[in-house]
Amino acid sequence: MLKFISLGCKVNSYESSALKELFFLKGFNETSKPDIIVINTCSVTAVADQKSRQIIRRERRNNPNAIICVMGCYSQKNAEYIKNECNADIIVGTSNRRNLVDFCVDFIKDKKQIIAIDDNPRKFTYESLGTIAIPNSTRAYVKIEDGCNNFCSYCTIPYTRGVARSRDKDEVISEISTLVEHGFKEIVLTGIHTAHYGLDNNGCSFSDLVEQIRNLYKFGMLQICSTKSENEQPLLSSP
């Protein structure tokens, strides 16, 4: 009764997996003939915008009786268009996603369109989506950060996801501990800009987080995604 479509980056993939687990915990399951379709959109380029629109319309056309839920960067800045032109049932952006299961339950009861968009991403806090289900793989992605402080002229991310916010250190460590216990040999830290971790003064710098992970857990490889050379803080301390 459930189908997820995730467009764009690794962060979107991670968030879709985490949300899928929340649905599973409420008794939903995946199927080829879904009653609920969740589309996690991307808006990093004009091409990504177009693809997001096409997917939403396609799923509505092919599944006229399904509940269509749209979330992500494209819906954050285009909720009115999705409401009026794509006929989606539930629209959230890059916040309020943790409430998506409850929104679906409410829609099943009331059949009333739900739009839950917070229109000031700069005030967003880190939204914890819980721990992802254990996939059948030796590599696991762990999200540690959301948002970006760079405000590049060509990029919409700070306007759709907000400025950098860090995930609680203990939550990161707990998720990695679970993954290591399940035999994972490769952990990939991911986020919109992982080196921005800790810049919101959460009490732990990015380099401190990496050092704690390396000291606590002895697994094969620790990788870091989505960081750049102009970091505002050292990535790692000297050995």
Walk through the language-model features, giving the residues of each:
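Proteins enriched for Cys/Gly/acidic motifs involved in redox and nucleic-acid/cofactor modification
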Residues: 1-197, 211, 235
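Conserved AdoMet/S-adenosylmethionine-binding subsite of the radical SAM
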Residues: 47, 51, 201-239
